[in-house]
Amino acid sequence: MSSYDVLRQGLNAPICLTWEMTYACNLLCVHCLSSSGTRAPDELSTAEAKALLDEWAAMRVFYINVGGGEPMTRPDFFELMEYSIARRIGVKFSTNGTLVDREAARWIASTDYLDVQISVDGASAEVNDAIRGDGSFSRARRAMELLAEEGFPFKVNHVVTRRSFAQLDGLHALVTGMGGQLRVTRLRPSGRGRAVWDALKLTQEQNRGLYAWLRAHPDVLTGDSFFHLSALGAPLDGLNMCGAGRIVCCVDPRGDVYACPFVLADEFKAGNVRDSSFATIWSESPLFERLRGWEVGGQCRSCGAYGRCHGGCMAVKHFTDTPLDDPDPECVFAPESGPTTTVIPLTLSPRPIRPAPAR
Amino acid sequence: MRRSDRVRLDDAVALRPEKFGALAYSYRDRQLFFIDQRLLPFVDSAGARQVGEIADELVASGELQEAAVPKLLTVLEGLRRKGVVHVVI
């Protein structure tokens, strides 16, 4: 049995568990997959969050991807991260970097089992700030500098768009020059991303260019984001499959469990940790059972590249009203859909950075 | 890997049982490893017994074919090179 078949049928616990700790954010990025900006009033309390971490430790979850919103806006952020690590659950947290001061940088650098990803969506303020908000590039860069001064090998996560594609080399040089590692991930039409999808998604020419660029830069991480591009030739590094409900899931700030961080929609909600245990939801939810038995069907099954891309990303299909058995809307064999101009006006504007809440 | 070697899991590696055997995760380099069911008794032996002794027992009980042992020891050697297990000295 191939690793694809083994993983498709689900595991005792997720490999990659995303915990969106809060929807509060001091930025308002135009492509935010969770439409973050405002704290949910019924967010999990510190005690509920700790009980969840206890459960994950019992399930031997190796690590969690912590995101949001901006996780550092939670007053109990450091407490919960230390609680997690003390239970041997490694933490990879995503931050916009605005709240990383020298004290936080020292804490990050001195904590084992902790990885940090700073979100940067362009190699210049002009490109980044149009998506993430005025001043966000310089604040993210400051966070990178502080971590570099502590000798900490931070990561930069870059959601590549048609506006930033030409800056990949520049961003790679900037990040690696500071001792960091670049991670490039796929834009999804999730959350507010739906409103800017047509304006920011890569052109087919850029998608082909990205495949070649990733092949030429094996040091660049992708979080298995671009498995739809593996149809172009030799597979990209990673499992090259949709892990939703199989090896991946997402817990939102209210404790709702979704199949993956990119499908925060009722159709993909498996349960809530306030109603039943996370372990029960993971192993018994009808939604997850269905996903584990399902494979993309339709015309993909007769495609020679099926074994490398497995039909692409479920979230991209869902939010573009594409049937799940159809090819990925960005299938490399599909004709270009929509304009190819690099700069198309955005229908949303990011908000300037809000003041940081007191710690 | 010699049959007289004893192996133990690296301190920074966590092991989780799965239907196919186990998943191993290294906190040191953030790598994930798939451990086949047949390999698990070796990886999880905590250095208590020689790998040849474990293999003989599995062969005797019919859980392993003698012909499969050299290949398993090669895979185990691969895990040693990647720092997942160490030979106990």
Residue ranges and their predicted role:
Chain B
Residues 1-30:
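Long, low-complexity, charged/polar intrinsically disordered regions in eukaryotic proteins
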Residues 28-89:
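Long, charge-rich, low-complexity alpha-helical segments
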